[in-house]
Amino acid sequence: MPPSISAFQAAYIGIEVLIALVSVPGNVLVIWAVKVNQALRDATFCFIVSLAVADVAVGALVIPLAILINIGPETYFHTCLMVACPVLILTQSSILALLAIAVDRYLRVKIPLRYKAVVTPRRAAVAIAGCWILSLVVGLTPMFGWNNLREVQRAWAANGSVGEPVIKCEFEKVISMEYMVYFNFFVWVLPPLLLMVLIYLEVFYLIRRQLSKKASASSGDPHKYYGKELKIAKSLALILFLFALSWLPLHILNCVTLFCPSCQKPSILVYTAIFLTHGNSAMNPIVYAFRIHKFRVTFLKIWNDHFRCRPAPAGDGDEDLPEEKPND
């Protein structure tokens, strides 16, 4: 270990590595499950795959870059900016994937009979591509000029230096807090989160109303359908809650930095907020395993088929996976 790394930094790196070691395999397992189980091929699970891809990238790319920034190497301004932007792209992709999931669940309970005609695989693919393109635009905005280059250049010139500034690479040194608060948080994080809360409230209202009507009419299949929708909606709302719980503290700290520059932010608070944002990428597979039956069964099948030391018992083949049913 290089002598320049303090004990505190070593602890930080250790926690980040642990998060990555949970996040990457867990989300790869989610993608694998959707690939092997035909019952996990509807639009919702395609959006979940998009979310899992972003979470894999957090563990495989963002966390190593965060460790690099924490060590604080000296580099050119735009090189540091390129290191800082991936987390913005992936965060935005996660938010838009969660929004797409919420809209998809709303359509499933609002227009159940027309759902498959409206939400086609092609449209779902277009929506996913649109989410990623928009995420790239939002996340790369600092590369287009909304950054701290002018301030850094002034300090660089004041020291009599010429050429592109060489700085100690830190997130707040290159990313403008005006961008993070006014554009990223107030436009692309907070409004989508509030919209998703409203959508899930409407979803729960529609499901409760349908369950009440169907129960009173003693209907079988519709009651079962909306019961399943309620269970899945609760699980996905939990994913949304965990995302908000993980990301809002860091955005609130950014607001403090912008609106109260003289306010001191305890290092432990900042690092806790960072750990929450990265740790969120490891939470989703755990929620899927405990809350969504199709995922749990498929995870067990993958484990039995590929990782157990002894052969899986007969009958653990594809026939044991949950079968896809209309509107299931």
Swiss-Prot record:
- Which residue spans adopt a coiled-coil conformation according to this UniProt entry? none
The keyword Transferase belongs to this UniProt entry's keyword annotation: no
A family per Pfam: 7tm_1
The record's subcellular locations are:
Cell membrane
Q: Name one GO molecular function term.
A: G protein-coupled adenosine receptor activity
Alphabetized UniProt keyword annotations: Cell membrane, Disulfide bond, G-protein coupled receptor, Glycoprotein, Lipoprotein, Membrane, Palmitate, Receptor, Transducer, Transmembrane, Transmembrane helix
Q: Which SUPFAM superfamilies match?
A: Family A G protein-coupled receptor-like
The membrane topology of this protein is: Multi-pass membrane protein
What GO biological process terms are annotated to this protein in UniProt?
Answer: excitatory postsynaptic potential; leukocyte migration; long-term synaptic depression; mucus secretion; negative regulation of inflammatory response; negative regulation of leukocyte migration; negative regulation of long-term synaptic depression; negative regulation of mucus secretion
Which residues are modified by lipidation (S-palmitoyl cysteine)?
309
Annotated glycosylation sites: 159
What residue ranges lie in the Cytoplasmic compartment? 34-46, 103-123, 202-235, 293-328
Transmembrane spans:
11-33, 47-69, 81-102, 124-146, 177-201, 236-259, 268-292
Gene3D superfamilies found in the cross-reference section: Rhodopsin 7-helix transmembrane proteins (1.20.1070.10)
Give residue ranges on the Extracellular side: 1-10, 70-80, 147-176, 260-267
The UniProt entry, under InterPro entries, shows:
Adeno_A1_rcpt, Adenosn_rcpt, GPCR_Rhodpsn, GPCR_Rhodpsn_7TM
Which SMART domains does this one have?
Answer: 7TM_GPCR_Srsx
Q: Does the keyword Disulfide bond apply?
A: yes
Q: Which family does it belong to?
A: Belongs to the G-protein coupled receptor 1 family.
Q: Which PANTHER family match?
A: ADENOSINE RECEPTOR A1, OLFACTORY RECEPTOR AND ADENOSINE RECEPTOR
Q: What does this protein do?
A: Receptor for adenosine. The activity of this receptor is mediated by G proteins which inhibit adenylyl cyclase.
- This protein's name: Adenosine receptor A1
- Organism, scientific name: Oryctolagus cuniculus
Q: Which gene encodes it?
A: ADORA1
